[in-house]
Amino acid sequence: MASSSPDAPCSCDCFVSVPPASAIPAVIFAKNSDRPRDEVQEVVFIPAGTHVPGSRLQCTYIEVEQVGKTHAVILSRPSWLWGAEMGANELGVCIGNEAVWTKEPVGQGEALLGMDLLRLALERSSTAQEAVHVIAGLLDRYGQGGSCREDPEPFCYHNTFLLADRTEAWVLETAGSLWAAQRIQGGARNISNQLSIGTDISAEHPELRSHAKAQGWWTGQGLFDFAEVFSLTQQPVRMEAAKARFRAGCEMLQRHQGNITAEVMMGILRDKESGICMDSGGFRTTASMVSVLPQDPTKPCVHFLTATPDPSRSVFKPFIFEVGVSQSPQVLSPTFGAQDPVRILPRFQTRVDRRHSLYRGHQAALGLMEDEQEQAQQLRKKQQRLEQEGLEALRGLLTGEQTPPAQGLGSLFQAFVEREEQAYA
């Protein structure tokens, strides 16, 4: 039987800043992906594609109908699955997802994972609003379900999403195939493993309210509060931690209101006291991402990804969709084809080593940082200098002080990955 208990350790935090909350004329997106401690997250570049009409697409567990054209995407994903925890496409759409439990039962059947929905939306959408509708359509047609971890004991949940583009952001929260969405055209917003959309609903499933009435969750009188109606009546202890992280995230965003930058978002993702930078028992922050999406369409979007666990001891490296962009082999996990435990039924009966090259180097460095204080300080300084170079490159691009050739921008992420790996050698 699939486990759907909210008491199981699982947490994520997503943030977005839309002008005037941002210090610059840009939307800024950020996410910490909190996953099983030993799970490896890889960074994968998928080029744009043209596909045969009517062809089928294999996702993590099920096939869906492919569309004619797909956008190029950069994904940070658990290396055993098809979808992604967070990512962006070439048009500047960013999405992060989170686990959520509601009054709607979590199905045990295999369908689309929330992470599959995320990737499909990035590949098929040109705006955040379009991505909301893509996910809603896929939910209606295929549903969501299946184990979300690489373990013989299934672990299932529904999903919430934070979606952003160059002009605005959306929060999309689901309960089975039902959903509600909220548009954010200014200010800062965060989500943390709980329903957070109240009465301010910008779009919703056509049967959302009638279903709530039929279940006896809403009388039909007064304002319809999505979070109040669909949240579990008796909140488990685990959800109290999510509430605390949500409040802490709100407070940090409010503290920096009008002055939010990529550096501010990175600082929030590194905050251990709040639990946003997670390291608890069998779970931890396994990868992080911050994206800067300028409102000026002539300026490139810059996506910073760690590809390694614990952002407080990792490097945010800049990725830009430009000429010459390709897959960085150092952050790509090995593949196992038909022998992969996710492909053999029953699934996940064995374990394989999915660590990529940068993960191995970083893992060794973390061990050193815990044992040797002096060397740890030297290594952390190297990480900070490298990250600062990436942030300075971002500032130069946004101000127009730097106009490097497109080929150079396309290979920027690869160059930073190589330098980080050298620092760990």
From Swiss-Prot:
Active-site residues (renumbered)? C12
Per the record, the similarity remark reads: Belongs to the peptidase C69 family. Secernin subfamily.
GO MF annotations for this entry?
A: cysteine-type exopeptidase activity; dipeptidase activity
The superkingdom listed in its UniProt entry is: Eukaryota
Q: Name one GO biological process term.
A: proteolysis
Q: Which Pfam families match?
A: Peptidase_C69
Protein name listed in UniProt: Secernin-2
- Record the organism: Mus musculus
